[in-house]
Amino acid sequence: MDGGLCFNSWSDYLGLSSLISRGLQPREGGESPRPRWKASSPTPAEPLPSKAAEAHGHKGCGFCRSNREAQSLYSSHRLRAPDGRVLCPVLRGYTCPLCGANGDWAHTMRYCPLRHFLRHPHSPRDGQ
């Protein structure tokens, strides 16, 4: 195999280290980064899951339920809209430290598309 085509985890060909470093630096104007788990402004009202969805175990937002939020919170909204946009106000306020995604396309580090590129080849796979 040609050595030039192999991925070298010690070289930063994609420039990800600078992307991450920029995300860790204070913002211009002395503004400090916003808290990562602050709830964002509410999204337009979305219908709650139907009775059929609830019968199949879909009882509100799985993200909030997994994080042991109150039932009144996690049952008040869904995690995602049918088109894939994030509806959860808690997750919408989170900014992924790897890629900077938030709002409609927010996700945690576990679901970040860049995590596969940043993982050390000999590290365990997320407890799996």
From Swiss-Prot:
Signal sequence extent: none
Record-listed Zn(2+) 1 binding positions: C61, C64, H77, C88
Zinc finger regions, Nanos-type: 60-114
Annotated spans, Disordered: 23-58
Residues reported to bind Zn(2+) 2: C96, C99, H107, C112
Location relative to the cell: Cytoplasm; Cytoplasm, Perinuclear region
Motif (C2HC 2): 96-112
MF GO annotations: RNA binding; translation repressor activity; zinc ion binding
Lineage: superkingdom: Eukaryota
One Pfam entry name: zf-nanos
Residue numbers covered by motif C2HC 1: 61-88
Stretches the record annotates as Essential for its translational repressor activity: 7-23
UniProtKB keywords: Cytoplasm, Metal-binding, Repressor, RNA-binding, Translation regulation, Zinc, Zinc-finger
Cellular component GO terms held in the UniProt record: cytoplasm; germ plasm; perinuclear region of cytoplasm
Record note on domains: The Nanos-type zinc finger is composed of two C2HC motifs, each motif binding one molecule of zinc. It is essential for the translation repression activity of the protein.
Assembly behavior: Interacts with ccnb1.
Chain's role: Acts as a translational repressor. Can mediate repression affecting different steps in the translation process: cap-driven, IRES-driven, polyadenylated RNAs or nonpolyadenylated RNAs. Essential for the development of primordial germ cells (PGCs) by ensuring their proper migration and survival.
Family: Belongs to the nanos family.
Name of the protein in question: Nanos homolog 1
